[in-house]
C-alpha cells in the first residue's frame, strides 16, 4: 500500500493526495458555457470533466462520477494530462475510487510510452513503496531526475547518499533538488544535505557551518525536521549558532504546528520542565492532546 504523502508528492497539475481532480477544480473555475456541448476530442473530454467538477449557478454539487468517466475517456484517447490523473487516482484512491497499485502502474506506464518523464517519478514511488524494488525505483527516478524533476532528484540523492561508494553522486543530486537560492526546490533535500555535512556520514565532508546554513534554508522552506534541528541549535547555542531561546521556541512551535510528533514531544518537554512551567501548563496540555490525537489517527 502506498503511504499517503510519503514523499511529499507535489503533482505539477495541482493534484493532491486523497482528493479527486483538485487541479481540475482550479482550472474549472475559468470554464465558460462551452461545456454544454457534448465533447468530441480528448481535450474537450478533459475540459468537460473539469466543468463537471465546477458547481453550477444553482448550487448543485460537483459531479465526481461524471468527471471520472470523462477523464477516463480522455485518457483512453491518449490525452496525457488525463492519463496522469488516472494514475494518481488509482495510486492513492479516494472519492469512490478504490486504491489499486497495479491499475495506477498501468496508467503511468501508458504515460511513459507517451513520453512523460514525470510518470517515471510516480513509477519509482510504486516500485519503492509497493514492490520494494529499489533498483527499478532508482532507474525510474534517475530518468525523472535527469529531466529536471526536483522530487525525483531528491529521492535519487537520498538513496545514493546512503552508501559510501555513491555518496558523492547522491550529494550532487541533493544539491540539484535543493535549488538553493532558487524557487522550486525541495526543502527536505536541504535537510538531507545538512545532515550529511553535520555528521560526515558515509564519507561526506564534515562542515558544520554549511550544515547550519542548510538547516536554516530548509526551515524557511517549511521542512519540520529542519525546523526542529535548527530550533535545538538556537536553544543550545551550538555549532556556531548564537543562543536565542525566543527564536528557538518560535521555530520549535513552527515544527510542532505542522503536526510533527518529535517537535510536539520536545515542545511539551520544554514547557513542562523549563522556567515558569506552571504558566506554560495550559499550552503544554493543549499540545499533549494534539499529540495524542495524532497518535490515535496513525493507528487507524
Residue spans of the language-model regions?
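Structural signature of tandem alpha-helical TPR/SEL1-like repeats
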Residues: 60-69, 97-107, 130-140, 164-176, ...
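Bacterial signal peptide processing site
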Residues: 31-33
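Short helix-capping/linker turns of helical repeat alpha-solenoids
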Residues: 40, 45, 55-57, 77-79, ...
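Terminal, low-structured helical/coil segments at or just beyond the last alpha-helical repeat
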Residues: 265-300
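Bacterial N-terminal signal peptides that target proteins for export
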Residues: 5-19
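C-terminal motif of bacterial Sec signal peptides marking the signal peptidase cleavage site
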Residues: 27-29
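Hydrophobic face of amphipathic alpha-helices that form TPR/SEL1-like repeat modules
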Residues: 50-56, 85-93, 122-130, 155-163, ...
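Canonical positions in the second alpha-helix
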Residues: 73-74, 110-111, 143-144, 176-177, ...
